């Protein structure tokens, strides 16, 4: 497990050596760094870890409008404790820590199911070389729950030995506090995994009731966070395009939720091949069917997204089950390709972009799988393929340069605020990057960005006052000349 700690540290070191921050150049600073800084100062100013009001953004706003980003995340709480440490450093440290914890939790989870330690290690590396690496420096709340999801799944394994739900409740609560929007999908994944265990037992009703009790305890423990957030979501009344539910029942074979896409699992074609292989083995058939339905049917994405939209980014919560399934199939890799397998291998190629490269990936996958029947260590060669995909999906231009960060942070503005005792600030420089910046809670801003903006206030700004919509949506209000 020491190697699983060193490898992600080495990858982050490579990024740092290029004079880059481990953060994306687009959304990372203006949504995550500045908001976390505002939230930790709200904790300090109210003297409680459960603040209710964010006075320095949007001229004062209910703090639960920002809970989408995780107001009770552990790095925010740590930032409130270490108030003199720059929030950017705390966030980077915490995200790297979560990556390492994810790999270790993945390895420990797989050890419950796989006999081959090398295979557990290999699957943990595949986890690192998925969409996780991209999202851990882009949209943090898409993946920051992942180590706790692996630990919750591992706790389910332990439950069927000890009959205790304590650890399920603990890790489930951590998932909610880090990413309430993705927690529903995580709990659906855990429910699926739990029921796969249950079918072996005659008295499955008792176990089912225990899981319901665990979920209820999670809701009660996090109620101070989840209940106000639900009211905020209801008040937001976010309008979405009319959904054609019948069209969502039609399978789509682009596999965006599984392959190559950063807004999905971001895996490579070997994983689809092995899921198909699992379909033809009794031990792994059920999970393969579940995964194939989830990745092919858009209606699953709609359900996992709380019926808001059918975007495939939510399918990243299936990553632990995909990793487990592929590990199980690889460990018992003794089968011949039949015509049905061949059809399922080839058919998605007609719907995936850059199909010639994907076809090459398919050929490489089949060759490596053939030669790894005897020696599983040969599968390590395939790591070069996802490594190339990660390199392609994470160019240096996607990271925030140190110089650009200093420009966004703008210490001169902070000095100006302190010298002139400025209380309210409109900053027309880098307006898209500083909209959530409160300069250590020294000023009140009219600007702010949150995905759960209140619809009445939103309507007042854009419909009554006729303020120009400067972003590609109505949830952000930036400093403008007419404010």
What are these regions (language model features)?
Residues 1-18, 210, 370-379:
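Start-transfer (signal-anchor) and selected internal transmembrane alpha helices
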Residues 4-9, 95-113, 117-160, 164-199, ...:
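Membrane-embedded helix bundles of polyisoprenyl
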Residues 7-103, 126-146, 233-238, 245-264, ...:
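Membrane-interface coil-to-helix junctions
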Residues 74, 207-316:
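Periplasmic/ER-lumenal interhelical loops and adjacent helix-loop junctions
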Residues 81, 380-483:
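Soluble catalytic regions of membrane-associated enzymes that act on cell-envelope
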Residues 89, 132-142, 176-184, 259-260, ...:
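Membrane-interface helix caps and helix-loop-helix hairpins in membrane proteins
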Residues 104-109, 150-158, 190-198, 275-279, ...:
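Transmembrane alpha-helices and membrane-interface helical segments
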Residues 289-296, 304-405:
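Contiguous transmembrane helix-bundle modules in multi-pass membrane proteins
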């Amino acid at each position: 497990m020491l190697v699983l700690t060193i490898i992600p540290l080495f990858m982050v070191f490579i990024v740092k050596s290029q004079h880059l921050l481990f953060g994306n150049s687009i959304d990372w600073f203006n949504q995550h760094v500045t908001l976390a800084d505002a939230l930790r100062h709200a904790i300090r100013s109210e003297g409680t870890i459960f603040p209710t009001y964010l006075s320095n953004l949007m001229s004062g706003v209910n703090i639960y409008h920002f809970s989408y980003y995780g107001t009770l995340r552990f790095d925010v709480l740590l930032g409130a404790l270490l108030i003199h440490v720059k929030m950017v450093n705390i966030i980077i440290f915490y995200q790297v820590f979560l990556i390492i914890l994810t790999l270790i939790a993945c390895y420990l989870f797989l050890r419950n199911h796989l006999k081959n330690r090398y295979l557990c290690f290999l699957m943990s590396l595949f986890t690192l070389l998925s969409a996780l690496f991209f999202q851990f420096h882009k949209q943090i709340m898409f993946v920051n729950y992942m180590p706790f999801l692996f630990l919750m799944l591992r706790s389910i394994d332990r439950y069927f030995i000890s009959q205790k739900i304590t650890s399920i409740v603990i890790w489930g609560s951590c998932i909610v506090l880090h990413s309430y929007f993705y927690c529903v999908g995580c709990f659906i994944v855990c429910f699926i995994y739990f029921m796969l265990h249950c079918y072996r037992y005659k008295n499955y009703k008792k176990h089912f009731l225990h899981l319901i009790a665990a979920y209820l305890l999670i809701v009660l423990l996090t109620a101070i966070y989840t209940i106000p957030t639900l009211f905020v979501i209801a008040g937001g009344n976010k309008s979405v395009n009319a959904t054609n539910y019948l069209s969502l029942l039609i399978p789509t074979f682009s596999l965006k939720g599984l392959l190559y896409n950063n807004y999905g699992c971001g895996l490579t074609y070997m994983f689809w091949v092995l899921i198909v292989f699992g379909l033809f083995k009794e031990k792994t058939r059920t999970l393969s069917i579940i995964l194939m339905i989830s990745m092919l049917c858009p209606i699953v994405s709609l359900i996992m997204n709380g019926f808001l939209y059918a975007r495939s980014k939510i399918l990243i919560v299936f990553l632990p089950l995909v990793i487990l399934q592929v590990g199980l199939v690889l460990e018992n890799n003794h089968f011949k390709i039949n015509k049905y397998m061949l059809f399922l291998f080839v058919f998605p190629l007609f719907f995936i972009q850059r199909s010639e490269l994907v076809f090459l990936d398919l050929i490489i996958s089949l060759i490596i799988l053939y030669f790894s029947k005897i020696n599983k260590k040969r599968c390590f060669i395939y790591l070069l393929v996802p490594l190339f995909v990660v390199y392609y999906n994470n160019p240096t231009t996607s990271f925030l340069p140190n110089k650009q960060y200093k420009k966004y942070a703008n210490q001169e503005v902070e000095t100006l605020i302190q010298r002139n005792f400025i209380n309210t600030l409109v900053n027309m420089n880098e307006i898209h990057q500083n909209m959530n910046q409160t300069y250590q809670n020294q000023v009140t801003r009219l600007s702010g960005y949150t995905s759960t903006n209140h619809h009445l206030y939103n309507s007042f700004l854009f419909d009554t006052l006729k303020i120009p919509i400067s972003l590609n949506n109505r949830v952000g209000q930036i400093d403008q000349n007419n404010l």
